[in-house]
């Protein structure tokens, strides 16, 4: 039980996919200008990452490995992710049309979010079992969500702040992301 908790904490805080592994930077920078859309994107990404991790594990364990088709792993995982994203898009469209409009193009772009594919591939490379794969996917999603929501809240405050002209827009966003990354480095000694 404690190894599962360590895996979760390590994935969320210590080995954060955005700030440490630099995966998922496109939605991190693209959707983080408004807190409302960042929260919606976080929920959608959490659902997709967790479900894609579980399904990718099942596809790899029960289809690719037994038939010695590991060379198709990346394509199979991309197909699984695309199916999960389509399902998520239909679910979001049915439950919240406003959120679907707010997320716009970013919802289908979860398919190309390298964090989702990265989690699926790292699950296989680190030889996680079913429960560890689910925890790893959920932890990566929670870490992504925390960083995205914190960053969007800071960007909303920066939009109202008196920022010098050369630093407006993307420049101050990158500086803020760097400072956030430094803050998360404080968690490095938390999990061995």
From Swiss-Prot:
InterPro entries: Ion_transpt_RnfA/RsxA, NqrDE/RnfAE, NqrDE/RnfAE_oxidrdctase. The chain crosses the membrane at residues 5-25, 39-59, 72-92, 102-122, 134-154, 171-191. It is an enzyme of class 7 (translocase). It is found in: Cell inner membrane. It comes from the Bacteria. It is a multi-pass membrane protein. One of its GO terms (cellular component) is plasma membrane. Keywords: Cell inner membrane, Cell membrane, Electron transport, Membrane, Translocase, Transmembrane, Transmembrane helix, Transport. Its main location: membrane. Its EC number is 7.-.-.-. GO terms for biological process: electron transport chain. Belongs to the NqrDE/RnfAE family. The complex is composed of six subunits: RnfA, RnfB, RnfC, RnfD, RnfE and RnfG. Part of a membrane-bound complex that couples electron transfer with translocation of ions across the membrane. This is Ion-translocating oxidoreductase complex subunit A. The lineage of its organism: Bacteria, Pseudomonadati, Pseudomonadota, Gammaproteobacteria, Alteromonadales.
